[in-house]
């Protein structure tokens, strides 16, 4: 329990102390923001700070800090350390700079930001990468909730069209189209804050349930320092990839520009971007604690939590909420596992529209131009989603790459932020250090993961267990990360700080 409380205190303190250092390094001022300067009534709309925070939290969180934290808890309470320090020194820094770099460049999408600071080649790579990733996220977050709704109807004894995935998938996609098309303050600005509050209440309820029920005890880090994973999966770098949104996530960089286009003042960035990520870290810490404590009494992490997750992540959420909060928890769990993915899915498609708009310089104030991008983006999502619902398309294997690509995107954004700070004559080490660390994480996992090069480099024991090639992956990951840092330092040595803001909307 004390480990959890210490980590919780560090997260809260980190917002004020290290978050203040990050903000001071960036140097927000009183310049006119894109929301005030452009204000097109569609994507550039001034929103109140509390709404900015809640929308940003729900955009970046969804079910990420819940699923990732529960999976991360398989390694034991050591996951508390990554959630805590990863959030403070990497994730929140990443989110702050991805949002503020966008704000300084008139709300540019992350692909355009990468191009400004890392070159034209990286811009094109990031454009394609971002659109594909966002459409994939949006599609999966349409199919998932549709399937859960069907399960609820079938469990209630309902039959017919309302008990089919295709029916609810079409309804979710229609909602996505509307939310992607209309002004951000019409739906997202109105209902997201409510769902954000529900996400926070659900986490608080779980925490209260753990502390008030004597049968649950949160294990201490110092008594369980090491991997407790049932399959013997290494902590490095699997845990760092698995937790994902609970500590750092490149997906957040695609969402931060949405709120960068809605801020009235640059000084709101600390609360909106850094603060939302710290809040997500707290949520992840609570769910990781639930994973470590609720199932330890039923046979230990190796059997209890693994068995719960084997029934599906949504089932695990349902189980945690029912054990900690009873009937109220079940209602919140159902709202969470259905509403939270949907609120991440619609902003994923909205971000895809904006990436394409920035790419092809298509003004989004006119409804015809928005329609021109919404139709193909949602059309591809519909083809993938309906194809999957009908059993014609299986993108499960492709989706397994998401965790790795997600953290690789975070790595790229941190390097872009490092170059930004160099050009601005600021302390670039505040982003270069986590960028180097995430480079090591990304490369190491690419060599270890069975969906990556691990399928060729790993071996199997007689009973089918995987023997990971850590002797190769660990040193190579570190060496490549150091080389990337060396390339960065060599590059800035050859360049001079210079003005670097681009006007995308003239």
What function would you assign to each model-found segment?
Residues 99, 209-221, 274-319, 386-393:
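Extracellular/periplasmic helix-exit of transmembrane alpha-helices
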Residues 123-127, 162-170, 275-284, 292, ...:
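Loop-to-transmembrane helix boundary motifs in multi-pass membrane proteins
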Residues 1-19, 72-102, 111, 330, ...:
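Extracellular loop-to-transmembrane helix junctions
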Residues 9-27, 129, 145-149, 165-212, ...:
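Membrane-interface loop-to-helix entry segments
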Residues 48-64, 207-215, 224-287, 332-344:
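Hydrophobic, membrane-embedded alpha-helices of multi-pass small-molecule transporters
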Residues 10-11, 15, 56, 90-106, ...:
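Helix-loop-helix module between adjacent transmembrane segments
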Residues 10-66, 268:
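Membrane-interface "cap" regions at the ends of multi-pass membrane proteins
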Residues 138-156, 163-168, 180, 199-226, ...:
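Hydrophobic alpha-helical segments and their helix-loop junctions in multi-pass secondary transporters
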